[in-house]
Amino acid sequence: MSAAILESSIEREAKTGPAMSPLLVLISAPSGGGKTTVCQQLLAARREMTRAVTCTTRPVRTGEREGADYYFLDAASFHRHVEAGDFLEHATVYGNSYGTLKAEVLGKLRQGKDVLLNVDVQGAATIREKAQEVPELKRALVSVFLTPPSLSILEERLRKRGTDSPANL
């Protein structure tokens, strides 16, 4: 799905809801499915949209910045957040933990900002479930799943990125 088509869908959703109701837009896909690219295009096209910075225990990739791309945590700090119930969702994928802080998402929604979340498939499912219990999230939620054009293209993307082991491909 191109960012232009997705942007059009989000625009329609924003117009059908209550005036000034912020949206929580979940973009999910398999690893290498284009989540980051689509999110970057959406953020460039919709200046009023902001992304929620998520937490991870994985190593920093080239060009990533603390607090802008992710909050990079050690395993002990991440576990403390899990135990405190601070995450809207969290999961371990290929040995690395990822999580979305409730305060990060709800704070931005309460400021009237549309929030974009780039999450894995597990994370999107968890957020959809939890949103049913939190009216503020349920009202704001728009969930989009991206599929790659083909499995061969997905494998090519993952190989080109060079961050996954051959066993994980």
Residue map of PLM features:
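Extreme N-terminal, non-catalytic leader segments
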Residues: 1-24
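Residue-level preference for the first positions of well-ordered beta-strands
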Residues: 22-26, 114-116
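Hydrophobic/aromatic beta-strand patches that form the interior of the parallel beta-sheet core
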Residues: 25, 52, 71, 142-144
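Conserved glycine(s) of the Walker
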Residues: 29, 34
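N-terminal phosphate/diphosphate-binding loop that engages ATP/GTP or pyrophosphate donors
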Residues: 37-86
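ATP-dependent NMP and nucleoside kinases share a basic, alpha-helical "lid"
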Residues: 79-86, 100-161
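Small-molecule kinase domains that catalyze NTP-dependent phosphoryl transfer to phosphate-bearing small molecules
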Residues: 163-169
